[in-house]
Design a protein with these regions (language model features):
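The feature represents the first ordered module of a protein
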Residues: 4-84
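Short, compact, well-ordered microdomains
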Residues: 91-121
């Protein structure tokens, strides 16, 4: 009886009590890596829509305080903060065309591999 009353009230009032999708953090990884110049740190964060699985936000960062001291020591990073996709490199920011998260993360890890081999930038 109670369920029928709730359904009647919600339909009469036009309420939508269906579960709304939420943006949920699905990846939260951090790893220390060795570099030609000291130790670095990799950070990967991904937030997805719980209903569709679409990636809503991401953050990829490579930090090494011996390579770069500005921008919280972020040498390289990609994110979608402020509503647009962009790349951070040594304190400079540039807009990027977003090829999809999988392709972007491959690009990021290729760039990090090259940076790790350099003694300085």
């Amino acid at each position: 009886m109670r369920a029928a009353v709730i359904q009647t009230v919600t339909s009469v009032l036009g309420w939508d009590l269906a579960r709304k999708s939420q943006v949920v953090k699905t990846v939260d990884e951090e790893a220390e890596i060795s570099c030609l110049v000291g130790r670095g740190k990799l950070r990967e964060e991904v937030w997805q829509d719980s209903a569709s699985g679409c990636i809503e936000r991401y953050n990829l960062a490579f930090v090494n305080h011996l390579m770069y001291r500005g921008d919280n020591t972020r040498v390289l990073g990609y994110d979608v903060a402020h509503g647009y996709h962009h790349r951070h490199f040594m304190g400079e920011t540039e807009d990027i065309n977003f090829p999809g998260y999988e392709e972007l993360s491959k690009r990021f890890f290729r760039e990090v591999a090259a940076l790790r081999k350099k003694g300085s930038i």
